[in-house]
Amino acid sequence: MTSVYRAMLVYRDAGQVHQEFEAWEKSLGECASDDCIERAYYTGISRIADVPSDFSWEGRWWNTSAANVSGGVIQFSHSADWSIVADIRIWAGLNKDEFTAEARKLNGMVLIDNMVDSKHCKVLFIPRLSGAIQAYSNADWGCRLLMPSGAFIDGRYVKSDLDPRPKATLQSLEIFRDAKVDERFRALVGDEYQKFVDTANIYIYQDDIDNIGATVVSMWVRGAANTRTAIIMYTANDIWAARIEPDDKGKLAFSYFSTQGNDTAKMPRTLAEWKLRYLSQ
């Protein structure tokens, strides 16, 4: 309820939302059982979220909040007055899983509280006037134990046959902060550019041990952190980059690119030490 309340303070008239929240809090005092409290929660959420009537649930919905190389797809089908079937696919890098649930319809929303293989994961889908769906789960407990490592079912879902998210770039991921550096990197690595994007499932800054004032970003794919990884190092004038992934025979292959030439003997210490974490030579 708190998450919905805070979100609606932004999207709706804050004064009205606050009044509805206070009225809901008072209604809880009239409850004498857990079932009554649960019903009051969903009634309050529906009112505060301004849930539209006659929402069209059936179809394929994509989680547009998911990170790069991660995602979620929910297929709602067999819609009835009080129930609907949800087929769910969630992934984060190479970690993935699929679930099926017969969800309940209540107060214009959809609630999953009987996920196959887990009775502790609850997910509430709230329809929005925009036509999107907002999903909230008990991720801190039940759903976190059920979902693939690093994956989340929470987020904003949009109905579409295909993934509606814009194609990611190293600039849109903010690995590069401006278009000029992104274009220079594209020119440097050529067709390998997309492979760097596809490796940027998780990415973090790391130290420039060469002390040349460079920005250094290392990245990897969840579920394959030791076999699908890359690093990019750049200054105002130069770029160095390397990537490791299995070749056609499953052996780890190393690729190196630099605006100063692709001689690995002249590779900066930052990249050389990074390489040693994964390859012995």
Please give the residue ranges for each predicted region.
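Short, surface-exposed coil-to-beta transition loops
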Residues: D35, N68-V73, N95-T100, D117-L124, ...
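Exposed beta-strand-loop-beta-strand "reactive/processing" segments of non-cytosolic proteins
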Residues: Q206-Y234
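Contiguous, well-ordered beta-strand patches that form the walls/edges
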Residues: H18, K26-G29, I90-I133, I231-I232
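N-terminal glycine/threonine-rich, aromatic-flanked beta-hairpin/loop signature
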Residues: A67-N107, E183-I209, V216-V217
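Amphipathic, heptad-repeat alpha-helical segments
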Residues: M1-H18
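Edge beta-strand at a domain terminus
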Residues: F99-K105, A139-T169, D263
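A short, surface-exposed interaction/processing loop segment used at functional sites
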Residues: G142-I153, Y234-L279
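Tryptophan-anchored aromatic micro-motifs
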Residues: S53-I74, V116, F152-V181
